Amino acid sequence: MDKNRRRGIERLCDEQIVPGTEVILLDDAFQHRYVKPGINILLVDYHRLICDDKLLPAGRLREPKEGKDRANIVIVTKCPEDIKPMGFRVISKALKLYPYQKLFFSTLKYSRLIPLFEEGEYPLDELLPHKHVLLLTGIASPEQMKMDLEHYETDITPLSFGDHHYFSAKDVA
């Protein structure tokens, strides 16, 4: 893409890079005011709700909490699978959303494991205890994924890169 989101979108449209494109979905574009979105979707971590967070550098917020009012949709991510209806209501009340804002909840569901040095795939629940796993991530908060894998008593070597890291061969060599 382009660090200048507006220019990147204009280039996509002008050059017809993907003919027939009707939707452009941007990650981490909530605070980019030069782009006029058709819909704003805000992702909020279940373990660190926006109402409990602080602005950088004390917290993870890039703008004041009130910025959430621009969101059309709020998705609370990384919810436990066994969350009760009361938990949904408590979070809904804490977020103080407006009637025009839709609230959704999501949970993590991992795909199948793909071994590096052999063919095939297998489900996470078939991960053998004491099997060595290289956990390569390029996401903002890999801690939950690491904790989920530790549940399987697996030997984990984390190799974590920042969110949106541009991987090179040197990174994984």
Regions found by a protein language model. Give the residues of each.
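Short, flexible loop segments at the rims of nucleotide/cofactor-binding pockets, characterized by
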Residues: 1, 49-56, 111-116, 161-165
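Phosphate/Mg2+-binding loops and adjacent switch elements
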Residues: 1-99
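Beta-strand->loop->alpha-helix junctions that form or flank phosphate-binding loops
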Residues: 94-96, 101-109, 158-162
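Redox- and metal-dependent alpha/beta enzyme cores, enriched for Fe-S-associated oxidoreductases
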Residues: 118, 128-169
